[in-house]
Amino acid sequence: PLNGIIGLSRILLDDKLTEQQQNYLNTINLSAVSLGHIFSDIIDLDKIDSKRIELNIQPCDFHSLLNDFYNFGTLMAEQKGLKFSLKLDDNLPNWLYLDRARLSQILWNLISNAVKFTDKGDVILRVQKMQDNQYQFSVTDTGAGIAPCELDKIFTMYYQVKDNIHRSAGSGIGLAISKNLAQLMQGDLTVESELEKGSTFYLTIIAEKAQAHDGNAEKAMQH
């Protein structure tokens, strides 16, 4: 049902709409996408405990996926009066072999956290091709920052950063699951932060270049 809501709202957003109708549909789409990723995090709790998370690796239109990240980040940021920017390397391929849903799940967690803990300024997503088949996604904010004593704890399941201003800090599972997924993608999730200045989360993954409509490319990885 959620996929139906997401798909139909995207189709309707391409129609001629009043500004109010567009705002309503953007809210519907963003809410459905957010709810879907929250469900994915909850479902993954049991899979992580039993070490049975499956990656569904398929040819992915990488630039289409990046456009989704831009749209999502912009909608999230606008709700708090923030600016969201997407900065891309010039040498990014059009298609990659990857699990689109899982990568979206990680970036949704990182972007939504960045917006949540930032009251003014910017949130920036940078995407770079590093070496060979390695790609890096960095999410930088100008928010509250994280104390040095907490940096080694934030990827622990159920841990919540101590923040007196942003008391509704979530469930404490998103970053732990995101790091687990990053490692399944032969990468990692790390963070650099400074109190009162902001944070940058670095996601690295390994992904081979793909061709459009490669029907023989579907792969599954179980860990």
Over which residues does each language-model region extend?
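Helix-loop junction within the histidine kinase core
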Residues: 46-57
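Short alpha-helical segment of the dimerization/phosphotransfer core of two-component systems
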Residues: 30-35
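Short conserved segment of the HATPase_c
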Residues: 7, 146-158
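Glycine-rich ATP-lid/hinge loop adjacent to the conserved G-boxes
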Residues: 159-170
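Glycine-rich ATP-binding loops of the HATPase_c
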Residues: 186-192
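Short alpha-helical Gxxx[C/S/T] motif in the catalytic ATP-binding
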Residues: 174, 178
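Short acidic helix/loop segment immediately C-terminal to the autophosphorylated histidine
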Residues: 13-19
